Curated annotation (Swiss-Prot):
Annotated organism of origin: Campylobacter jejuni subsp. jejuni serotype O:23/36 (strain 81-176)
InterPro entries (alphabetical): RNaseH-like_sf, RNaseH_sf, X-over_junc_endoDNase_Mg_BS, X-over_junc_endoDNase_RuvC
Major localization listed first in the record, in broad terms: cytoplasm
Gene Ontology terms: cellular component: cytoplasm; Holliday junction resolvase complex
Annotated family: Belongs to the RuvC family.
Phylogenetic lineage: Bacteria, Pseudomonadati, Campylobacterota, Epsilonproteobacteria, Campylobacterales
Protein name: Crossover junction endodeoxyribonuclease RuvC
SUPFAM superfamilies reported for this sequence: Ribonuclease H-like (SSF53098)
Length: 160
């Protein structure tokens, strides 16, 4: 059975997304990119993020949606901003799609590389290898979103 998965890596400057099809252990990347968030007021940035997500859902339908949870940050302002972005994304996904899966950065790293403490570069290398891609994927926000989708695909296979 083919499953179309949307993987999301929320960020304060860019939100990475990946659209992947998973079928019997074979994963095919359909599209990946960024919702770019311009420097502005927080309210405008949240609106921009939600409009970008609306556009993705307008152009695609999904069986599953997975989002990476907030990572630990030393700057409290950054954590608060990310939490607000994540809350807005969560609400938008629930309104458009319904339920979604959440994975911590450690879960994503472990699922993709086998090591919970892997670097972003190690994750990027394994994403490229697992999907059989010839070119590097940049920026790493996109790679992280693909890794979230791969993690969810692997988790679904375990549950089925």
């Amino acid at each position: 059975m083919n499953l179309k998965i949307l993987g999301i890596d929320p960020g304060s400057r860019n939100c990475g997304y990946a659209i992947m099809e998973a079928n019997k252990g074979k994963n095919i990347l359909i599209e990946a990119g960024l919702i770019k968030i311009k420097p502005s007021t927080l309210q405008y940035q949240i609106t921009e993020l939600c409009e970008g997500l609306d556009l993705i859902f307008k152009n695609h339908s999904f069986d599953e949606v997975a989002i990476e949870d907030i990572f630990f940050a030393y700057n409290p302002k950054t954590v608060l901003k990310l939490a607000q972005f994540r809350g807005a994304l969560s609400l938008k996904i629930l309104q458009i799609h319904g339920d979604f899966a959440e994975y911590t950065p450690l879960q994503v790293k472990k699922a993709v590389t086998g090591k919970a403490k892997a670097t972003k570069e190690q994750v990027a290398f394994m994403v490229k290898r697992l999907l059989g891609l010839s070119k590097d994927i940049k920026p790493l926000d996109i790679t992280d979103a693909i890794a979230v989708a791969l993690t969810h695909a692997a988790n679904l296979r375990v549950r089925v």
